[in-house]
A protein has these predicted regions:
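Low-complexity, intrinsically disordered/propeptide-like segments
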Residues: 13, 17, 26, 34, ...
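Conserved hydrophobic/amphipathic alpha-helical signal-anchor segments
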Residues: 25, 33-81
């Protein structure tokens, strides 16, 4: 009897490899995007939880805790107060990516893998409001750009100075779009009118690495 068993030819195997490669190229970005979106949800929850704890502290003490004296990472400034001393948080939230880039606010550096905390003015009262910031992997969650955060300014003077950042004038983006026509680190403020490919309230970035999620209170 003839042997009816037949193996794959080299050409057939190459075709299978090519098909697998095409499928992987199509599916992998979607999987990575889904994972990034999941991490962004965790970032939003983390910043919201910190903000809630800060409001409880402010209600009890009449002020917000001071930032770290060096890098403006939220954990370094707030963990001992909000977790260890007051018990407002069981654990202090961190970025779901331990190697997430440090988020700079103004001229102050953040810390890798940590959220950033920075106090600003409110109604010309110093340190009466704050910014909590993280990276964002998707434009769906992003509401700010790195350029916007680096434009934040709080002078050392006890009285409000022109150009200082106030809660009432710091505007977040309604959405963030990616375009090569944008500045390197993204928009410094939301668009004030439709034009240049943006709608009023929108911001832009050249690279998703400049996407940020921010809570301002």
């Amino acid at each position: 009897m003839k042997n009816l068993k037949k193996g794959f030819t080299l050409v057939e195997m190459l075709i299978v490899v090519v098909i697998i490669g095409i499928l992987a190229a199509a599916i992998l970005p979607r999987l990575q995007g889904a994972q990034g979106a999941t991490r962004d949800v965790a970032r939003e929850k983390g910043l919201t939880d910190i903000s809630t704890a800060l409001e409880l502290y402010a209600t009890a003490k009449g002020e917000y805790p001071a930032e770290s004296t060096t890098k403006k990472d939220a954990e370094g400034a707030l963990k001992e107060i909000l977790v260890d001393q007051r018990g407002y948080l069981k654990d202090f939230p961190k970025d779901p990516q331990s190697n997430a880039p440090a988020v700079k606010v103004g001229t102050q550096d953040g810390t890798i893998g940590q959220y950033t905390y920075f106090r600003i003015w409110r109604n010309a009262v110093k340190n009466a409001a704050y910014i909590l910031a993280s990276k964002s992997e998707s434009s769906d969650k992003a509401n700010a750009t790195q350029a916007m955060l680096e434009g934040v300014k709080v002078s050392s003077a006890a009285t409000y100075a022109p150009g200082d950042t106030d809660f009432n004038t710091f505007q977040l983006c309604s959405s963030v779009v990616k375009t090569t026509r944008c500045a390197v680190k993204g928009s410094t403020a939301p668009a004030t009118a439709d034009g240049n490919g943006l709608k009023k309230g929108e911001c832009c970035v050249q690279d998703n690495a400049e996407l940020r999620f921010v809570v301002v209170r």
